[in-house]
UniProtKB/Swiss-Prot annotation:
Predominant location: Golgi
Keyword hit for Transmembrane: yes
Transmembrane segments: 51-71, 98-118, 127-147, 155-175, 187-207, 220-240, 301-321, 325-345, 352-372, 378-398, 412-432, 444-464
GO terms for biological process, alphabetical: carboxylic acid transmembrane transport
Record membrane topology: Multi-pass membrane protein
Keywords: Golgi apparatus, Membrane, Transmembrane, Transmembrane helix, Transport
Listed name of the protein: Uncharacterized transporter C1002.16c
Family statement drawn from the similarity comment of this UniProt entry: Belongs to the major facilitator superfamily. Allantoate permease family.
Cellular compartment(s): Golgi apparatus; Membrane
GO cellular component, one term: cell tip
Length: 499
């Protein structure tokens, strides 16, 4: 056992790194304790960088494509709307808004069960099943002929897609350390933005097939996107490894490096058996609900913006085909800014302040959408401002929670709980954009939602800072804590919350 100094501690005086990962900062200590750097652990910095490069080379494009296809299948209903779907299916009143919202009913209900099952079922099987099932559902959506059929298809699609994001996020936490997560989960949310850009470009091309084979262009949109997803689902079974230490894309040397990393993170990863204690701990943790409520506001904007952006731009007076390509640069900006923000948060080990800064842009954007109803140029510019923070806020907040929850089953439950509460915002988002062309109710609701989320991020920063201070005092006053051991969970005094 190492005894701890009883002298006053200060963050600037040094830092302790756990064996959980060579780069994970756990708690700041007094200057009587020698900091353990990356070079003192089993892997050198060059070895670590080499390993991460090999992992990212295969995993990054794989998860990006999977989530891009999923978000494309989910949000292409917006492209189909401006391409004539409501008229062809004779939708009346608020039936389209119901179609947009009902997806999230089954999506919410099945997120948590799917995530908790992933480790038992095995990642490659679970992910392949999810992708193939939602792709087939998307294909069948192209053959719907009335409101009832489309309603059923959207309910099934919600069930099939429910586990994809939490399973991918959880899978990444099994491979990457807490401070390495931000840019990796960034790939997922960047994909959601890119799906809008790709969806607009793809829709612009496919809608020219209107009438081919007797099918409307929006039907071809669903059919072709579903076929692409099906191919991806089959491929992922052979690409994603269940055991990363035996991954086919790692050399023998890199496999050995990965084994060392996993041994160093053993306490967090060893949960081979289901742990009800971890599940219960997630449900009783105050900060999980703080993350979930702030994510609810972020996702209200995300789902409203990503689903109805074509309709919002169409309401400015542009033609159906023009709308499809006008959405592309807006989505690309959203993806680019989110990736940049995630790398900044990873570099400086801060999430909250970047979330707050990012949210300023959509707050201004929604104000412009409400205040400048008769100026098309300003309205279109406002869409760019919204895209800057909409994707950044939703993505970084999930990363923030993932980095501050441990061990495995508590993290799995917390991610699922956060997303279940947050994704219920999709039901709200589907209902607020119902009064074209100005969509005042939608923009006002989104403005209020993102403002409240920003306030909650501020509260969360102060809460976590207070908890870190308490942990630091506990370490400074204890003479029995073994610093050579990993934190058992995020409540452990050696576990430092990322702000």
């Amino acid at each position: 056992m190492k005894s701890l100094s009883h002298t006053s501690s200060n963050k600037s005086n040094g830092s302790i790194f756990t064996k959980a990962d060579e780069s994970e900062k756990v708690i700041s200590r007094s200057n009587t304790a020698s900091p353990i750097s990356i070079e003192n652990t089993h892997l050198t910095k060059s070895e670590r960088d080499s390993l991460l490069f090999r992992l990212d080379l295969v995993l990054a494009p794989t998860i990006m494509i999977l989530y891009l296809v999923a978000f494309l299948d989910r949000s292409n209903i917006g492209n189909a709307k401006v391409a004539g779907l409501p008229e062809d299916l004779k939708l009346k009143g608020d039936q389209f808004n119901i179609i947009a919202s009902v997806f999230y009913v089954t999506f919410i209900l099945f997120e948590m069960p799917t995530t908790l099952l992933m480790k038992k079922v095995q990642p490659k099987r679970m992910l392949a099943f999810i992708v193939i099932s939602y792709s087939l559902t998307t294909i069948f959506t192209g053959f719907c002929h009335n409101f009832g059929g489309l309603l059923a298809a959207r309910l099934v699609l919600g069930f099939c897609e429910a586990g994809l994001f939490p399973c991918l996020a959880l899978y990444l936490t099994m491979i990457y350390s807490r401070v390495e997560l931000a840019p990796r989960i960034a790939y997922l949310f960047a994909s959601s933005a890119l799906s809008g850009a790709f969806g607009g470009l793809f829709a612009y091309a496919v809608l020219h097939m209107d009438g081919v084979g007797g099918f409307a262009g929006w039907r071809w949109l669903f059919i072709i996107e579903g076929l692409i997803g099906f191919v991806c689902g089959v491929a992922v079974y052979f690409i994603i490894p269940n055991d990363i230490t035996k991954a086919w894309f790692l050399s023998k040397t890199h496999q050995e490096m990965m084994r060392k990393r996993q041994l160093e993170r053993a306490a967090d990863l060893e949960a081979a058996h289901f742990d009800w204690k971890g599940v219960k701990s997630a449900f009783t943790d105050f900060k999980v609900y703080l993350y979930a409520l702030s994510e609810f506001g972020q996702d209200t904007c995300l789902y409203g913006f990503s689903t109805f952006l074509p309709a919002i731009i169409s309401g400015m007076g542009y033609t159906s085909l023009s709308v499809q390509y006008m959405t592309i640069p807006v989505y690309i900006l959203g993806a680019a800014t989110y990736i940049a923000a995630s790398f900044l948060s990873d570099r400086f080990h801060h999430r909250g302040i970047i979330l707050i800064i990012g949210n300023i842009f959509p707050i201004v954007g929604y104000i412009l959408l409400l205040a400048c109803q008769n100026n098309k140029s300003v309205l279109y510019f406002a869409c760019y401002l919204c895209s800057v923070g909409v994707y950044t806020g939703a993505g970084l907040n999930v990363t923030w929670l993932s980095a501050n929850i441990a061990p495995h089953y508590k993290r799995a439950t917390a991610i699922s709980l956060q997303l279940a509460i947050a994704n219920s915002s999709g039901i709200l988002a589907g209902q607020i954009y119902r009064y074209p062309p100005k969509y005042i109710a939608g923009h006002l609701t989104s403005l209020i939602a993102i403002f409240i989320s920003t306030v909650l991020h501020v509260v969360n920063i102060f809460f976590l800072k207070h908890q870190n201070s308490k942990k630091q005092k506990s370490l400074a006053s204890s003479s029995t804590i073994d610093l050579s051991e990993q934190p058992k969970d995020d409540k452990d005094a050696r576990f430092h919350y990322i702000l």
